[in-house]
């Protein structure tokens, strides 16, 4: 079974990786070895830091409950691998660029040719403001990919991450690169990462796919200007002319731009919410992996933006059940925290001390992030599907309809059903000699997974 390297570039790449993690937690990518690599010139990018925190929570849960990885299905059963052994980010990118201006990287005063002539040329292309802009910022109108590529080349050259991939590469490994076509980091990063793979003979044979996320929101034109969209179109044309032949497949995520986001050049304020476009990109990655790179082009046109059927029509409906299991788990988990019915479970497994200090905290944090992610999706004006009672209900049961929606079941008998199933699962696991030898944290998640699946099946068969 090959390893899946996911290069998430810039804020959009990190945002897509966030959705991928939600899918992983719900049971997608079963038994796959996922190696996320976040690349961003901006050390304080909000989306990147949000995803790094989520990766940390997932990893902590996985480390405590490693046995779940061997299951054929269930929550948190994808193996998350930290190739750096100290975080999922190529830290050198932002570290090397700290307190540097683009002009420092260009070093055009040191050109060995006619210095005056080339100084004039560069000044005419970029101007004083762009040249003296902080190199760790990426979402800048005229700097765009030209200067960002110089910064990437400066920071990626000789980076050990590519040598590590070379040393451990297997023929069935996959490389998936995700980035936007509108931010300087995404455009520059995609090109420079592909250049790195081009220059490494041992990595030439690996399957490579690129997922391009096109503009899916509006920004204040007075602050950013028209080049936001023009540069995206120009980049896509450039990419297909120069790079598309060097990869196995390219996927373009298109959608209507109907939302306005505040303009931020970078830093902690650049944190865009989850959106159907970034979720589509995550589903595309899932489909690539599930089909071992044999997936045909997935084209969600604008007329299908509001159609729940899109998931099923493109063969992506299988994840619906996984999402429903995890959604039920997350909802009930929060309800359980207000209830003491499972005190016997805690006492028997001696979970009070362990979970409240370690796994409990990580899982609680992940559940809160999952709920935030769902809420952000529901506020998107363009929906692949709504994360509300009716459409979540449709996702779980296909075309069958439960009157008043899924949430009405939560408010009614579902919580009692879950309590009963939680207790029943606990008794089954705890009386099974083999299972009772599992570490307490691992047994805890096995119980949660078993009870969630039973409740979801109860909904389907009701």
What kind of feature is each model-predicted range?
Residues 20-21, 185-197:
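Short Gly/Thr/Asp-enriched flexible loops that form oxyanion-binding sites at enzyme active sites
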Residues 1-25, 29-173, 193, 202-462:
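Terminal, contiguous helix-loop blocks that mediate binding/assembly
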Residues 9-15, 179-190:
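Gly/Ser/Thr-rich loops at beta-strand to alpha-helix junctions
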Residues 174-178:
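Beta-strand elements within well-structured catalytic alpha/beta cores of enzymes
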């Amino acid at each position: 079974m090959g390893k899946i390297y996911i290069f998430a570039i810039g804020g959009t790449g990190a945002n897509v990786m966030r959705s991928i993690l939600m899918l992983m937690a719900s049971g997608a990518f079963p038994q796959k070895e996922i190696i996320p690599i976040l690349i961003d010139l901006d050390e304080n990018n909000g989306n990147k830091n949000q995803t790094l925190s989520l990766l940390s929570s997932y990893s902590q849960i996985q480390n405590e409950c490693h046995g779940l990885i061997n299951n054929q299905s269930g929550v948190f059963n994808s193996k998350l691998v930290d190739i750096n052994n100290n975080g999922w980010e190529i830290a050198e990118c932002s570290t090397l660029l700290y307190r540097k201006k683009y002009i420092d990287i260009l070093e055009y005063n040191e050109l060995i040719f006619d210095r005056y002539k080339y100084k004039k040329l560069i000044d005419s292309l970029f101007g004083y403001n762009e040249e003296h802009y902080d190199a760790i910022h990426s979402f800048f109108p005229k700097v765009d990919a030209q200067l960002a590529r110089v910064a990437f080349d400066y920071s990626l050259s000789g980076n050990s991450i590519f040598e590590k991939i070379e040393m451990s590469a297997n023929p069935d490994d996959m490389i998936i690169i995700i980035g936007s076509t509108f931010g300087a980091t995404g455009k520059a990063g995609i090109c420079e990462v592909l250049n790195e793979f081009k220059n490494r003979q041992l990595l030439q044979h690996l399957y490579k796919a690129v997922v391009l996320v096109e503009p899916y929101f509006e920004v204040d034109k007075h602050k950013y200007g028209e080049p936001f969209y023009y540069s995206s179109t120009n980049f896509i044309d450039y990419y297909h002319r120069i790079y598309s032949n060097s990869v196995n497949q390219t996927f373009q995520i298109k959608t209507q731009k109907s939302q306005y986001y505040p303009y931020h050049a970078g830093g902690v304020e650049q944190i865009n919410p989850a959106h159907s476009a970034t979720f589509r990109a995550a589903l595309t990655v899932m489909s690539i992996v599930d089909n071992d790179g044999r997936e045909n082009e997935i084209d969600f046109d604008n007329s299908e933006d509001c159609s729940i059927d899109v998931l099923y029509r493109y063969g992506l409906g299988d994840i619906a059940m996984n999402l429903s299991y995890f959604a039920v788990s997350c909802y009930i988990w929060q309800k359980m925290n207000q209830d003491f019915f499972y005190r016997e479970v805690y006492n028997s497994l001696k979970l009070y001390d362990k979970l409240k200090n370690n796994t409990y905290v990580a899982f609680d944090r992940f559940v809160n992030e999952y709920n935030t992610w769902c809420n952000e999706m529901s506020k998107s004006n363009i929906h692949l599907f709504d994360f509300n009672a009716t459409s979540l209900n449709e996702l779980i049961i296909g075309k069958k309809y439960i009157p008043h929606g899924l949430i009405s079941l939560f408010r009614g008998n579902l919580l009692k059903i879950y309590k009963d199933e939680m207790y029943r699962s606990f008794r089954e696991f705890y009386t099974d000699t083999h299972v009772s030898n599992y570490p307490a944290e691992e047994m805890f998640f096995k119980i949660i997974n078993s009870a969630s699946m039973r409740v979801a099946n109860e909904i389907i068969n009701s």
